[in-house]
Amino acid sequence: MKPLSSPLQQYWQTVVERLPEPLAEKSLSAQAKSVLTFSDFVQDSVIAHPEWLTELESQSPQADEWQHYAAWLQEALSNVSDEAGLMRELRLFRRRIMVRIAWAQTLALVTEESILQQLSHLAETLIVAARDWLYDACCREWGTPCNAQGEAQPLLILGMGKLGGGELNFSSDIDLIFAWPEHGCTQGGRRELDNAQFFTRMGQRLIKVLDQPTQDGFVYRVDMRLRPFGESGPLVLSFAALEDYYQEQGRDWERYAMVKARIMGDSEGVYANELRAMLRPFVFRRYIDFSVIQSLRNMKGMIAREVRRRGLTDNIKLGAGGIREIEFIVQVFQLIRGGREPSLQSRSLLPTLSAIAALHLLSENDAEQLRVAYLFLRRLENLLQSINDEQTQTLPSDELNRARLAWAMDFADWPQLTGALTAHMTNVRRVFNELIGDDESETQEESLSEQWRELWQDALQEDDTTPVLAHLSEDDRKQVLTLIADFRKELDKRTIGPRGRQVLDHLMPHLLSDVCAREDAAVTLSRITALLVGIVTRTTYLELLSEFRAALKHLISLCAASPMIASQLARYPLLLDELLDPNTLYQPTATDAYRDELRQYLLRVPEDDEEQQLEALRQFKQAQLLRIAAADIAGTLPVMKVSDHLTWLAEAMIDAVVQQAWVQMVARYGKPNHLNDREGRGFAVVGYGKLGGWELGYSSDLDLIFLHDCPMDAMTDGEREIDGRQFYLRLAQRIMHLFSTRTSSGILYEVDARLRPSGAAGMLVTSAEAFADYQKNEAWTWEHQALVRARVVYGDPQLTAHFDAVRREIMTLPREGKTLQTEVREMREKMRAHLGNKHRNRFDIKADEGGITDIEFITQYLVLRYAHEKPKLTRWSDNVRILELLAQNDIMEEQEAMALTRAYTTLRDELHHLALQELPGHVPEDCFTAERELVRASWQKWLVEE
């Protein structure tokens, strides 16, 4: 064993001072001194449990002792009689065995492969023991879940990721998916439960037993987000539901995740074999699957963006050439050829890597370099985490931990360790780039005229610029030169560094060559230099634009087309990553896929890190907004589709925000107990206005109200018990907070909740019964108008159906035509007096006479006036489809409805384009005269004439 280095010998004296008397220095072996000096986790553990150190000294850890874990744990659990005792024994057992593993790892008593096997088997042993104990307890309490034939149904657990692959790291989350075979009911209990209820309750208890921190710590952090539908999906699914999901909706990333899935415990039982056979066709295609290559290229880009986003320069997992890239290389071959080559279907990385080499898919040299790098990186990762039992892959910056790692990795000092690390990661990165390179060969850098370089470096006199700027007017030439000079002055005020300056000197001649070829060169350059000023100290982004000429061209064209986009990119340069792939830049996410895309995006963020969750939500929204705007500018999205995309995006954000707020509130207070015997959360979010009407614009706020169906006597079931209705009030407040909190990426949305009953004076969240009563007995006509454009944008089916019924009932009430006409007209006149005619010789597209609001009032009036006779008018909440319904139900002539629809979409289209130009929503008075005249005539017909 290598002696401790000088810094560690000095630190040993600090350790000695902490040790209790029974662990006196003279009684400790050299091995014990080394491990206690290296790991604070081991040190703290043996101080609390001195008998563990005695055991370690007398029974040194062995490579095959994982075979005894189950028996040792069974003995520890033999006298456990309740859940609290189970939680305590599981935590103590995990800590005791982790100390033994840390001891063996620090002293290199066993191979790194053995360490990974022991860590994974320990986790599996603890998970299975907890499951089996709880299954028996739940069966005693609720009866045994059975299928239609009366056969007992088990809970099967899929271990995902490194747990499934038998490669768990020292301090790790565990990713699980729960499933049961067949539907049925419990037998032998006090009352019958269906299997879904039984396994959901049991699953919740299992997560609590493993995950909940106590005075003894926790067993593992449990992550269930890889299950179908993520956090919004059922906690446990039947085999049939799993099969339907993966056949109909399984995404590429879920295929990648399922490669490593392994059934915990009895993996050879009948049900285990059935589940495995069901999943195999989804993961491994029977044909050679080259369709996956583009997805893998996209994932490569995601990795690179993740590294840039989080500044992961010292991260041995996610950094360039890190563990993630080795895993990715291996998965490439598994997913492309695994259906044809059974040897590639292993869950574990090293056997699969050997199979790849045997099939000559990689050279022997590359495969060996990857194997050696993987074992080096995994040992370094596990040693790093075992210092404090901390989930980290970032290299330390302090001298003590650097000295610890250098010693344990068998290097003389830190520089020698980092030198070897760099060599390994360079090898990995080379193979990674060769394997997942772009399908187009990189073109040679275009030769640039020396004049563009001179223009950037201020080596040209004004007269000399004529040849390169000949197509520009004299004023524009002067403006371009002034912009370049001002930009250089701004650079002098900033600390860029030699590398940043070098990249900028390479980038700017290309940029000027492309920009100055345009007729609008001066305007475009002014927008781009404003953006560059914000990123010149962040060399990564300059390199992105310098190395990817296509990204630079997209930047120029988008900034030329829209100052709004230029401003967004300047405020949030992370969005520059979106310029790399034109396939996604100009092709927004499918309208029904925003929720799934967001769920995948959030998987990268720790669930308990609220700050990162808030940032991720905002970053996702901004990236999607950029794609929608780019497609709008390119003309690939008509105005109706722009609003559809903006609305679906907002609904995905609402879904995620409610989910986060719910998790936080339930962790604090538990759930309202009226939910124990029903599905859903008893909560709904109703969208009004532009959100309700599928008509959001780029900068629209969200008009929301919150509903619940909680009984008066309900309480929460957590340790901090509160009134159920108080829970929903705090939930709504939390949702508002998550939307409005300003982070470095701004706010998510402005939210206006004043359309709730009694407005700002009313409760933030309203019971469904109170909402119905208010609408029937207290609401004004304008509130019924607002209800025309209202719909549930988040909520369980029960509450959604209730709201829809109330809305339909209110809208179909018989109304006296003249009275309604007067009330609607007078409300519009008040609004026009307050909001319209504010700009002399200008037409406010929304607020002035003949504008958008007049069309909205016409449709609302006609729905309220005629829905009693034609209930089908209540079906839709958007103006365009309401106009269709009015024509279909013979209330409005088809020609008039089509003309109003054209006027409405034309005016909305102009508002979108004004927003892209960062211009206010008014135009010269002589614009849209035909549309305005048409709207005035319709207004006169319906709301003035008797």
From Swiss-Prot:
Region feature (Adenylyl transferase): 449-946
Name the record gives this protein: Bifunctional glutamine synthetase adenylyltransferase/adenylyl-removing enzyme
Superkingdom of source: Bacteria
A GO term, aspect molecular function: magnesium ion binding
Annotated spans, Adenylyl removase: 1-440
HAMAP family named among the record's database cross-references: GlnE (MF_00802)
InterPro entries in the cross-refs: GlnE, GlnE_rpt_dom, NT_sf, PII_UdlTrfase/GS_AdlTrfase
Enzymatic reactions: [glutamine synthetase]-O(4)-(5'-adenylyl)-L-tyrosine + phosphate = [glutamine synthetase]-L-tyrosine + ADP; [glutamine synthetase]-L-tyrosine + ATP = [glutamine synthetase]-O(4)-(5'-adenylyl)-L-tyrosine + diphosphate
Keywords of this entry: ATP-binding, Magnesium, Multifunctional enzyme, Nucleotide-binding, Nucleotidyltransferase, Transferase
Cofactor: Mg(2+)
Assigned EC number: 2.7.7.89, 2.7.7.42
Pfam families in UniProt: GlnD_UR_UTase, GlnE
GO biological process terms, semicolon-separated: regulation of glutamine family amino acid metabolic process
Gene Ontology CC entries for this record: cytosol
Family annotation (CDD domains): NT_GlnE_GlnD_like (cd05401)
Enzyme class: transferase
Gene source species: Escherichia coli O8 (strain IAI1)
Similarity annotation: Belongs to the GlnE family.
Primary role: Involved in the regulation of glutamine synthetase GlnA, a key enzyme in the process to assimilate ammonia. When cellular nitrogen levels are high, the C-terminal adenylyl transferase (AT) inactivates GlnA by covalent transfer of an adenylyl group from ATP to specific tyrosine residue of GlnA, thus reducing its activity. Conversely, when nitrogen levels are low, the N-terminal adenylyl removase (AR) activates GlnA by removing the adenylyl group by phosphorolysis, increasing its activity.
